[in-house]
UniProtKB/Swiss-Prot annotation:
The modification Phosphoserine is found at residue 64. The lineage of its organism: Eukaryota, Fungi, Dikarya, Ascomycota, Saccharomycotina. Its main location: nucleus. GO terms for molecular function: ribonuclease P RNA binding; RNA binding; rRNA primary transcript binding. InterPro entries: RNase_P/MRP_Rpp29-subunit (IPR016848), RNase_P/MRP_Rpp29_sf (IPR036980), Rof/RNase_P-like (IPR023534), Rpp29/RNP1 (IPR002730). This is RNases MRP/P 32.9 kDa subunit. Gene3D superfamilies: Ribonuclease P/MRP, subunit p29. It is found in: Nucleus. It comes from Saccharomyces cerevisiae (strain ATCC 204508 / S288c). Belongs to the eukaryotic/archaeal RNase P protein component 1 family.
Amino acid sequence: MDRTQTFIKDCLFTKCLEDPEKPFNENRFQDTLLLLPTDGGLTSRLQRQQRKSKLNLDNLQKVSQLESADKQLEKRDYQRINKNSKIALREYINNCKKNTKKCLKLAYENKITDKEDLLHYIEEKHPTIYESLPQYVDFVPMYKELWINYIKELLNITKNLKTFNGSLALLKLSMADYNGALLRVTKSKNKTLIGLQGIVIWDSQKFFIMIVKGNIIDEIKCIPKKGTVFQFEIPISDDDDSALRYSILGDRFKYRSVDRAGRKFKSRRCDDMLYYIQN
């Protein structure tokens, strides 16, 4: 600072000090003022961000513990829900089979041969059994309104079959969901199963669980996939009876529908299924 400027001495030191010359005599007052360049506060901002984002070992351990606890809770919930669904399905099937046997016994004891008469009798005399009976009519919308629309959209089926790709359709059918499909057993090692037709209520790993329309009472049957050929039709339009017919080799479908959706089927030897041709 220039000494010729008398503002500091006349205006400041004379009011604050008895001797205005004292700071100059003691060399407490410098002639120049040193100024350093600044970065506009960038360094301080970076330092604050580093302090906020700094993670010590304790914080990392807490985060990992919270993540592991969330994963374990999610896994336990999934296992519990999956277990409960399996238990509920098993109980439903066993309960339906037990009540079906009771109905057949009542029909034999009362010499009832008509289906409507039997249902009317059970509804009046045994309402608890009637409420838990599986009825084929209740599952028909599952086939007509859900599965048919689903499979048509999956295969891109239209009234004009000239643009239909058959090889691509086979690939999609191998990964399709058959819950709600109307299947018919055409060949089987168990001869008593041949000719059975029903709507699939659950596509399990080794069985097609179907509701079958009976002469006296509707039943739920577990049809094994092993050694069985299933057949189904996809109607092209509602105007006529034209449909696409396909067959399922149960031995190649022994996978859950969830696993089959992401599985790529490869060509393999078929000598283990010669009985299909021989029979």
